[in-house]
Amino acid sequence: MQITTQTIDEVLYPKIEAHTTGFLEVSNLHTIAWERSGNPDGIPVIVIHGGPGGGSQPSYRRYFDPTKFDIIQFDQRGCGQSTPYAELEDNNTHASVSDLEKLREHFGIEKWHVFGGSWGSTLSLIYAQNHPSRVLSLTLRGIFMCRKSELHWFYQDGASHVFPDAFEPYRDHIPLPEQGDLIKAYYARLTSDDVCLLYTSPSPRDNTG
């Protein structure tokens, strides 16, 4: 059976809109955006997006039966509609775990299902390790553990052989002497105070989910 976009569309639940949206201040600097869809009285499930640096997508709602689940989504610090956008200060894994607990407490939820994809699968596991009594179940998809070997495959030497046409512009933007460590090279540019350098850096698409 050939899997197509149409095939995937047929097996997912219908598209729905969020019925409630809001923001939660989680630190003196960061405020995270959240939304809820599905059944307000249903089984709570928190959806943890990928990246790091991605954002929650409307399509994620379609993994769940909207008549049975209270679907909770949020944008992690610096992502999506959360503010300040793209802020790295006070933005780390432990802060994200803390934010999940603040969201849970904000909604008055005792326990919830945890659903994470890509980087979100890593964050889901860390959250579950730190707060096992708050987790009804774990669902992990597109598992990405953020290990050095995985980062190297995705950003340096691995995906480059599978999708060479997509990889070449990302690689070739960096001067040849720096191409041995593309993550380091891009980090230096994207955190630079040189505005000209910052805005000439392309934004490679994050397809990790």
Task: State what each model feature region is.
Residues 29-84:
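Conserved HGGG/HGGXW glycine-rich cap/lid loop of the alpha/beta-hydrolase fold
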Residues 111-149:
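Conserved hydrolase catalytic core segment
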Residues 85-96, 149-157:
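Catalytic nucleophile-loop/oxyanion-hole region of alpha/beta-hydrolase
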Residues 97-111:
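Conserved acidic catalytic loop of the alpha/beta-hydrolase fold
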